UniProtKB/Swiss-Prot annotation:
The lineage of its organism: Bacteria, Bacillati, Bacillota, Clostridia, Eubacteriales. The keyword RNA-binding applies. This is Large ribosomal subunit protein uL14. Keywords: Ribonucleoprotein, Ribosomal protein, RNA-binding, rRNA-binding. The gene is rplN. It comes from Clostridium kluyveri (strain ATCC 8527 / DSM 555 / NBRC 12016 / NCIMB 10680 / K1). It comes from the Bacteria.
């Protein structure tokens, strides 16, 4: 579960390395986000010459969560880290590459471009 102040790794080549969650979108009292949810985040560290800079406020979609997710068939999927992909306003990724595996649940939430760029879909 991702909440305010959670640090996430960035799983794309947009230039950011680490972001911190400011808000989970989807209601005024929403406290936690999981895989496929959109968050507003601040860039905490970035590579020089990247698209995004340190201190910039961005929107991102959660692609990996250490908490895990229960699927409809009763199985669970859990990752070693919390990771997100920085997106534009039209839900397209700002980077051109995705690093690491992503969950299949992103297809239900219309993030097909992220799924097509990912090296592995679990």
């Amino acid at each position: 579960m991702i909440q305010q102040q959670t640090l996430l790794k960035v799983a794309d080549n947009s230039g950011a390395k680490e972001i911190m969650c400011i808000r989970v979108l989807g209601g005024s009292k929403r406290k936690w986000g999981n895989i496929g949810d959109i968050i507003v985040a601040s860039v905490k560290s970035a590579t020089p010459g990247g698209v995004v800079k340190k201190g910039e406020v961005v929107k991102a979609v959660i692609v990996r969560s250490a908490r895990g997710l229960r699927r409809t068939d009763g199985s669970y999927i859990k990752f070693d880290e919390n990771a997100a992909v920085i997106i534009k306003e039209d839900k397209q990724p700002r980077g051109t590459r995705i690093f690491g595996p992503v969950a299949r649940e992103l297809r239900d939430k219309d993030f097909t471009k992220i799924l097509s760029l990912a090296p592995e879909v679990l």
